[in-house]
C-alpha cells in the first residue's frame, strides 16, 4: 500500500521521507525500495513523536516546507502543489474536505463533532475553516521550528491542537479544498470509542483557547482605554 503512494509522489520529484514509527511489517523496506528516505523509530512514539521526527529531519536537510501525506492513499499527491502554493500567504495550510470539492461524507456524531470543532477554530483564528481534523497539511518555514519542538503528542493533537498551537504563536492558518480518496488499506489508528474521547478532549482544548482569546482581547481593550 505505501509503495503505491510513494510511486505517485515520486512522479512529482519531491524529496519524500517516511517515518516508520516502530512498525513490525515491511513498511521501511517498501519505502526504501520506492526511493524514499526512511527514519525508523525503534519503538512506537505515537503520532506526535513521529511528526516531530519528520519536522526535525526536514529542518536538518535544509527544507523550508513540509507536506504531511497519509500512507493509506486518502491524500492525493496531485493536490500537494496546491497546498505548497497556498504557503505563499499562510504558515499552515489544511487540505480541507467539506469545502466544495469531492464527495467525502461523514455521518452521525463524528460529523457533528467535526462541525463543532471547525466552527470553534474558525472563531478562534478568525478564518473560515471547514475541516480542522484533516491530516493533509502543509507547514511553512515559520511553523517548522515550532512544530519540531512542540508538536502535540496525542491523537487529534496532530490536527486540532496543532492549529491552536500555531494560532497562539501568531501564525497564519488557511485551507484549500481537496478531494479525499477512499482508504486504500490499513485501519484507523483509534477505535470509535477512543476517537470519541479524543474529540471531546479536543473540544475542551478549543473551549479553553477561545476563553483565553476573549480574556486577551478584553485585556487589550482595557489597556487601550487607559492609554
Regions found by a protein language model. Name each.
Residues 1-4, 25-34, 78:
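Acidic helix N-cap motif at the loop->helix transition within catalytic regions
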Residues 5-6, 10, 14-23, 39, ...:
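Short beta-strand/loop segment that forms part of the nucleotide-sugar
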Residues 12, 33-35, 169:
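Short, structured coil segments at secondary-structure junctions
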Residues 20-29, 73:
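A conserved acidic beta->alpha catalytic loop
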Residues 37, 41-60, 77-156, 182-200, ...:
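Acceptor/aglycone-binding surface of glycosyltransferases and processive sugar-polymer synthases
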Residues 63-74:
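Short beta-strand-to-loop acidic/aromatic patch adjacent to the donor-nucleotide binding site
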Residues 128, 154, 163-181:
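Catalytic donor-sugar/metal-binding loop of nucleotide-sugar-dependent glycosyltransferases
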Residues 196-210:
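A short amphipathic helical element positioned immediately N-terminal to and/or at the very start
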